[in-house]
Design a protein with these regions (language model features):
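Small-residue (G/A/S/T)-rich helix-start motifs and N-terminal tracts that mark the onset
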Residues: 1-126, 134-151, 156-208
């Protein structure tokens, strides 16, 4: 079968114990881009998940309306602001090991323009979620700008908006795998169970 299951033994192979004399600089530098007026919880929860996942340093780019909310939710994170109620420009002026974009970012005209401009110059693989995917579903001409090796994390409805519906869940898995290959991305299907289509290893993993 082309499908494998993820269990505790699988995860143990990736687990790395932290060295006693290490520091935050040894564990990566991440940037999260998202949030808008009324949707700051999404980027806040995503930032918490990023820190929980083990990143050493994390910055967030958010609109200024959410600064106080975000810093109260995630005091461990550093914070950059752009725009008042929505992000209007996305500029990355330093090196990051990982960049995530989309949670709560909105699909406003200014944000769509900001994402399109960012994708035209970005060469680094991205983790794209939520409204970043909703923007791509409306502006499919942007799909060819997605950096190779990026990660999409759609739930079922976000996936349907991007790639169309499937008759059943098995066909959706096959379709998601084909789209991952076509776009040179890694496709992480959210739901009660998760399906991961990894481009580099050409494998499909099911998390039960």
């Amino acid at each position: 079968s082309i499908y494998n299951t993820i269990d505790k033994e699988t995860l143990r192979r990736f687990y790395k114990k932290r060295k006693p004399f290490s520091h935050k600089g040894n564990y990566g530098n991440a940037l999260m881009i998202g949030g808008s007026y009324g949707m700051m919880g999404a980027i806040g929860l995503s930032a918490k998940a990023c820190l929980r996942g083990g990143v050493g340093k994390m910055k967030a780019l958010i609109p200024s309306c959410g600064y106080q909310v975000f810093q109260t939710m995630v005091p461990e994170a550093m914070c950059l602001t752009n725009g008042e109620q929505v992000i209007q420009h996305i500029r990355v002026n330093e090196s990051f090991d990982a960049i995530g974009i989309g949670p709560g970012i909105s699909t406003s005209e200014k944000t769509v323009e900001a994402l399109a401009s960012f994708l035209e110059t970005c060469k680094q693989a991205l983790v794209m979620d939520a409204d970043a995917l909703n923007i791509l579903s409306k502006k499919k001409e942007l799909l060819h700008l997605i950096p190779k090796g990026s990660v999409f994390t759609p739930h079922a409805k976000e996936y349907e908006r991007m790639f169309g519906s499937s008759v059943n869940s098995m066909l959706r898995l096959e379709h998601a795998r084909a789209e991952a290959i076509r776009l040179n991305i890694n496709n992480f299907q959210n739901g009660f169970t998760q399906a991961i289509f990894a481009l580099k290893s050409n494998t499909s993993e099911i998390n039960w």
